[in-house]
A protein has these predicted regions:
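Hydrophobic, amphipathic alpha-helical faces that serve as interaction scaffolds
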Residues: 49-58
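Non-catalytic connector elements of ABC transporters
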Residues: 40-41, 47
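Long, amphipathic alpha-helical coiled-coil segments characteristic
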Residues: 1-33, 37-40, 59, 63-86
């Protein structure tokens, strides 16, 4: 789980940077990376959210991105709190 924490924070920052740059394809690519690692540690809610970002990013669906993105950091935060408590 320790190998998940820092990379996940970095990928979330990539997604935020891509959002600021209005680069939907980069959001999709970063969402794909975090989706896979989230699923591998059992963080299914985060993985599902990242799957949405991957799909909407690849489709350049800004409405979908705008709906999903605000949930990213709070969801990751809950997972990181849980991991730190182990």
């Amino acid at each position: 789980l320790g190998d998940f924490v820092e990379p996940s924070k970095e990928i979330v920052q990539e997604i935020k940077d891509a959002y600021e740059a209005r680069d939907a394809k980069a959001i999709g690519a970063a969402g794909h990376k975090l989706k896979s690692s989230s699923r591998s540690v059992g963080a299914n809610a985060l993985s599902d959210l990242c799957a949405t970002l991957e799909k909407t990013g690849k489709a350049e669906d800004w409405d979908g991105i705008d709906d999903a993105l605000p949930h990213l950091e709070p969801t990751l935060g809950l997972i990181l709190e849980y991991i730190e408590g182990l």
